[in-house]
Amino acid sequence: MPTLLNDKEVEYYLSKVKYPNCSPLTVTDGTIARNASQWDGQTGGAEIVKMLGHSMQAVSLPKGQSLSYRITTDKSGKAVLHTALIPTQPNDGGDLRFSVTIDDGQPVVFSLKEKFRSEGWKENVLRGQAVKTLQLDNITKGEHTITIKALDHHIIIDQWMLDFNPQRKHYLFPVVQSTQ
């Protein structure tokens, strides 16, 4: 049995499979998604960790430092911002906090700290990401800046996604791969 299908075989098998009410999650489907390594600005010390995370290039961010991303939305209204980080445990007994700021708004603080072997901890470890969600009641159409800041040590950011369909279920973020 061959390990790879040729184009004709792929076409044949795809024509036989039907997925009703299922549409692919794409960048143009009301989402903007990026790998953390695709930043537009950083305050210093950010290190790309190759082969780590869903992105395979997660970013270790020192305490007090931040990454910023400039985006342009073609929609306005309710949205959610999902931020995915590598699930880690503080080795100093502290917390694992980071903040997210949209434009000049108030920073929203999240904690990744989970009780060892709790359901949240298990889900994060099995997924390979700890995903935190920020509800946005009215994001406007146009240009915005998303800033993610490490408030504690051991913060490793993997990906983020802004989604104008807050109820959407997903597993992977529809990012365009970076060559960085």
Segments (PLM) and residue ranges:
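Extracytoplasmic
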Residues: 1-180
